[in-house]
């Protein structure tokens, strides 16, 4: 598995699977939930859950006789919002009211942990824009971020505006292991690359 996770963006897990069934069909699997269970040094498993958004056959597994290899990609339910283009008007609603109206029809779990109250927007327009970009734009304007939590069988979107709502990770220290100086890899979570980068940004906001 190769995966990426971000704050205020979509996670993506590219997964290689094996099965004795040589005739698994994408139409039966795409859109279905998938959960990965990862052993950790703490002894308790870590779960990663998503929805299968693409599925393909690779071929016979070279290492396991009578097994066939498949590949799939797992993404959060919020990925569905990237697949539409919509135009609509929201009247007398706050950013959280709008988010609730956009997300609720999908029927997937999300929770709001925002600590601030937000202004009522008299008139807010989504015009020829997918709903993911629309919500991201509103969240960025208001200083709201989001992330996903994973459990065995599901994942949940969490919307927040305060770091005080974040849960501490089980271990406060993550070791650094450079592949350039030490061969092999430890059987624990670790950082292998740390990069510092400067960028040109605007310094003023004028209205």
How should each PLM-predicted stretch be described?
Residues 1-207:
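Amphipathic alpha-helical and helix-coil boundary elements used as assembly
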């Amino acid at each position: 598995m190769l995966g990426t996770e971000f704050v205020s963006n979509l996670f993506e897990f590219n997964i290689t699977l094996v099965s004795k069934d040589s005739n698994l069909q994408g139409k039966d699997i795409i859109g279905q939930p998938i959960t990965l269970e990862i052993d950790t040094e703490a002894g308790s498993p870590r779960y990663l859950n998503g929805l299968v958004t693409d599925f393909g056959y690779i071929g016979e597994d070279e290492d396991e006789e009578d097994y066939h290899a498949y590949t799939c990609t797992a993404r959060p339910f919020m990925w569905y919002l990237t697949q539409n283009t919509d135009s609509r008007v929201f009247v007398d609603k706050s950013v959280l009211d709008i988010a609730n109206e956009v997300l609720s029809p999908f029927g997937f779990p999300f929770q709001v942990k925002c600590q601030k109250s937000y202004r009522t927007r008299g008139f807010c327009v989504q015009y020829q824009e997918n709903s993911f970009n629309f919500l991201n734009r509103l969240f960025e304007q208001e200083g709201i971020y989001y992330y996903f939590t994973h459990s065995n069988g599901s994942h949940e979107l969490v919307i927040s505006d305060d770091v005080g709502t974040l849960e501490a990770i089980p271990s406060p220290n993550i070791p650094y292991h450079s592949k350039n100086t030490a061969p092999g890899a430890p059987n624990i979570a670790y950082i292998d690359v740390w990069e510092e980068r400067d960028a040109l940004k605007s310094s003023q906001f004028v209205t």
